[in-house]
């Protein structure tokens, strides 16, 4: 009630007809923090009650009925009467011994004080501060010394303005002291400014019971309540002291609205209220909604989302005119579809069929006399060795082929095929080409093989096969086979060169030029000039046994 007395009963001047002091800008009661001396920083400036973030005001007084020289003293006194000198002190420009004193401008009647700060003292320095007030005669209301001992409210002070002017005779005239509204320290929860910082929701059912989380500045859990007010209605949120978390958060449930059968939303005010001094925070809007089955407010969220989507689409730069646009003109441009000839796929290196792929059943119609062939001749046709790809040149004794030969087959590396059983005709392309060619040949049993190979019997050119070392020749063949398996491509010229070197008995000559296709020779690597008595002397059974081994 003491805070309301200056508003209801304003202080009257001591002399109605004489000068008096009036406070036209009160100091701001809350929001300022009292600073300790040990903090080593300025205590700030006391703002005016109408001060904002953009417009700063300060405590201001007006001396009515007087213009001229004078002095003013501003000191701190207690909030409650008797107004004793307060142990806190004013600091700033023109401040000493805990109070402010300066001369007034004689040309003005309104005076503002911008550089006033409040510095608080510790409880252990309380007695020393009171003794200093008594020694400096800082006692505006002349409170006896015995009454100055006792408890002090260190979280609230008042400003006391004492103005001294000159009377017509030039003597000092002390005007009646004037007190300001209380100023509270913002550090103390019981006197700090109440402020709602944030809530998780600002609407609820008219039946109440909705849980709300509220964040605020420091409050005292035993001296705080959530206050709802509306037109002709007021209520309080329900919570316990345990629902106040660290003085900065409150979890409460909303009270039911006065009209439970609400049909339209109603807006009310929600505030923090301190019962001890009836201090209220700035109001925050809260909306009571009609009770429906939609407890989770799905329809409300859907409508809000729809409205947001509509507003976005209206502002969208891609939202063009609704008139149908003319069709886009299209120009026919001829295109040339060039059919690219596909490149031929790389073909693997081909080899003619070896003796292992010949179907010897085809030789049954042929009448060949029995004979023996030397072991050296049998070694000329190994089953696993590749054969030189060479075109056979028909001689005068050969009959032309009835049909062109098939393409040479691809040599597939692998183990030699067993010839213990009859070898069937191969179905692959190119297999059995040599056998088909031999099938269409007609031999005379009395015809000399040398005539077929070139009719050359010069001993200086050819050497008898009996002089060939079979073991050395077999070793060379084995080396050729291993080389053909280890390398990517078979060495086709390995066997003819080795045979020539062994037959002639000379060292390996330098690589000769490629042999022309017209050169006489056999596909198994024998030179066409080698002399056999007759092809009928060849024992094919011995040849087959040698191939199978």
Swiss-Prot record:
Name its GO BP terms in alphabetical order.
animal organ morphogenesis; antiviral innate immune response; canonical NF-kappaB signal transduction; cellular response to angiotensin; cellular response to hepatocyte growth factor stimulus; cellular response to hydrogen peroxide; cellular response to interleukin-6; cellular response to lipopolysaccharide
- Where would I find the Glycyl lysine isopeptide (Lys-Gly) (interchain with G-Cter in SUMO3) crosslink on this chain? 37, 122-123
Task: Tell where it localizes.
Answer: Nucleus; Cytoplasm
The record lists the effect of residue 310 to R as: Abolishes monomethylation by SETD6 and interaction with EHMT1
Q: What happens when the gene is disrupted?
A: RELA haploinsufficient mice show cutaneous ulceration, epidermal skin loss and a predominance of neutrophils and macrophages in the dermis and hypodermis in response to TNF treatment.
UniProt xrefs under SUPFAM superfamilies? E set domains, p53-like transcription factors
User: Which PANTHER family does its entry note?
Assistant: NUCLEAR FACTOR NF-KAPPA-B PROTEIN, TRANSCRIPTION FACTOR P65
* Description of how the protein assembles with itself and partners: Component of the NF-kappa-B p65-p50 complex. Component of the NF-kappa-B p65-c-Rel complex. Homodimer; component of the NF-kappa-B p65-p65 complex. Component of the NF-kappa-B p65-p52 complex. May interact with ETHE1. Binds TLE5 and TLE1. Interacts with TP53BP2. Binds to and is phosphorylated by the activated form of either RPS6KA4 or RPS6KA5. Interacts with ING4 and this interaction may be indirect. Interacts with CARM1, USP48 and UNC5CL. Interacts with IRAK1BP1. Interacts with NFKBIA. Interacts with GSK3B. Interacts with NFKBIB. Interacts with NFKBIE. Interacts with NFKBIZ.
Name listed for the protein in its UniProt record: Transcription factor p65
